[in-house]
Every structure is written in C-alpha cells, then in structure tokens.
Amino acid sequence: MLLGHAKYEGILQSTPAITVLHGEARFMNENCLTVQLAEGGERTVAFDRCLIATGASPALPPIPGLKGTPYWTSTEALASDAIPSRLAVIGSSVVAVELAQAFARLGSQVTILARSTLLFREDPAVAEAVTAAFRAEGIEVLEHVQASRVAHAEEEFILTTDRGELRADKLLIATGRAPNTRTLNLEAAGIEVNPQGAILVSHTMRTSAPHIYAAGDCTDQPQFVYVAAAAGTRAAINMTGGDATLDLTAMPAVVFTDPQVATVGYSEAQARHDGVETDSRTLTLDNVPRALANFDTRGFIKLVAEAGTGRLIGVQAVAPEAGELIQTAALAIRNRMTVQELADQLFPYLTMVEGLKLAAQTFSKDVKQLSCCAG
C-alpha cells in the first residue's frame, strides 16, 4: 500500500493538471460519462480522449451452494494470517498452481480440482511435468474433476464431486479473472467486447471507438502486469498524437512454481491451429550440466521450429530457473533466428540458459555424445 501510494496516488494528487474522482463511472455516449461519487452525488465528465484501465477481478464459477460461503479468492488467500490444515483449490490456472504449492510448502494438505489438467492451455508435457512435481511433494491433483455442489458447515467445506465428497478447512477459488467492464455501459460508447466481457483492442490500444483506448486486464490481451504497463504506455503515446504499437508475438510468460514454467511463442498445437508445420525437439534436464550440478533434473526445454526453414517460433521450458532463460528465447524468436543459428551461439558453461543451446543442437546432433561444452 505504501509503495502504491508513493508511485501512483501521490503522483496523481500532486499534479495540478490531474483531477482524481473516486466513484463508479458509466458511459453516457462516446464523448461523455457520469461518475457516481463515493462521497455522494454525481458528476458528468466530457472528454476528447478516454483510456479504460479498470483491470479484472477473480471470476466465480457457477457452482451451486458456493455463494454465501467464506471461500477464498487469491485476495483473501494472500491476506490470511493463518495456514489451513486442509486446503481445497478449484482451478488449474497460474494463480491456482502457484498458491497451491505455496500453501503446501507452508504446511497445508492441498487438493487441487482441475476441470481438465493443470495449466491445460500449455503444451501437454508442461502439465505432465508440473503434475508429477506436485504429486511428488504430496499435493493431490484431481484431474478432470469438477465440484457439483459446495456446502459449508461447522467451519468445514464439503465439496461434492463425481469421485465422492472432499472436505477442507478452506476453499480457494482460482478459476481465472474476469474483466471489470460489466457496469461501464460500454455499448453506449460503441465499444465492442468479447463473450467474456473483455474490451477488444487493436495493436495501438484503440477500441472500436477510435478516440477511446483501453489497456490492461480489462482488455482481450494477456493478463500480465508487464503487458498492461506496455499497453498503457503505448495508449498514452497514441492518445497524444503518436503512433506506437504493441507486438505480442514473442511475449514471454512465467509461472512461479517449483520447477518454474516459462513459455514464449508458439506451442505445437497453436502452430497447428494457425496452419504452421513444425519440427520440434525436447531436451530433458539430465542433459543440462547446470541441472546436474544443482542435483535437480526435473523438467525439460522444448524448441518448436518452423518446418523447412528451421526458424525458431516457440519455446516451452519446465525447470527450476526456467524464467531466467526465457527472455533469451524471446530475443531469438524476435530476431527470427533459426535453431542452427541458436546452436552456433556462445553460451556460458554451467548456466541454465546453456540448455537453450543444447536443445538447439539436438536438431542436428546427439548431445549425449558431446563433451561438456562442445560448440
């Protein structure tokens, strides 16, 4: 809170040209909105340009009995001053897996109910590796399981599933985040949204109303703080006469579990969906010297190349330091490098990022037969 005040609220309040209104805004038309002020009353605001950056909130699945129970979202979980003996987690998203493992390591007996698999939008090998790691440390992962009813009695949650009842002291709902757009009356301003209510934006952050821009988790862009920051910067530039764009084709993403998950670019399935033929290789971490030195060879590095050209178009990694290597992969993709060009680069020995070079070498060599740092 102190950091937020110093970096944001304090700056806004100390800038004479900025007026801060606390309340709920609603569009009247494409050039005017009203604000129901928190202290009472209403104020009309006319504008030439508008930026919508209302963020997102935890989504609530329509499970009978859930409303009215003291369930947790990520907000309550992170604010808790006690560790539950038994924690049930509904969801398989990034937030679900990060918090599930955190509470397990703090001492909770954790059970995850995944409608599909963990991190189901990623390459299936990612889900398999994370699930195996979780189960190895005692986290129960129930795949293809949904709760059909939730009850709370005598300080205990009872979840009804097709595999029987599950009881827990606390229940964490982590099934994604919904954009905060429902009350904005966007249709009055001619602003289009997708079926989930996310505002559709172009690569310049413009909405379907040319003078209205949007950035962050309220849009149809990936919900990451660095994407929101980049989008907001570009929106501000364009709202003041500039011409800035945001290219997300090589956007890295990291899941902070242990081992970490890091991805950038295409997975095989995504490439196939877009009609791109691929050639892929997977290097297990027992072939990476740094992983051997760490005595932790859980995971892999997978490179996805465009068939025929060998151009690198995607990387998926599961490793204890996967997040530290993914930006190198992003730069390689951004610069349209082939896997052979990546394999020919010099990487420092005994670093995890060296695994990218080794993975690239597997397209033309058997790395098991190479010396420790063969070029």
What are these regions (language model features)?
Residues F256-S267, R272-G375:
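Flexible, glycine-rich terminal cap/loop adjacent to redox cofactors
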Residues M1-E9, A79, P84-A88, V94-E156, ...:
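Rossmann-like dinucleotide-binding cores of NAD(P)H-dependent redox enzymes
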Residues I52-L113, E137-V141, E187-A189, V193-T204, ...:
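Glycine-rich dinucleotide-binding loop and its adjacent helix/turn
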Residues A6, T19-H22, R26-A38, L106-H203, ...:
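A Rossmann-like FAD-binding core segment of flavoenzymes
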Residues K67-I83, E165-M239, E324:
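FAD-site-proximal beta/loop scaffold in flavoenzymes
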Residues A17-T19, S57-A59, E192-V193, G242-P252, ...:
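A short alpha-helix-loop-beta-strand transition element characteristic
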Residues M28-E30, T34-P70:
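Glycine/serine-rich phosphate-binding loop and adjoining beta1-alpha1 elements at the start
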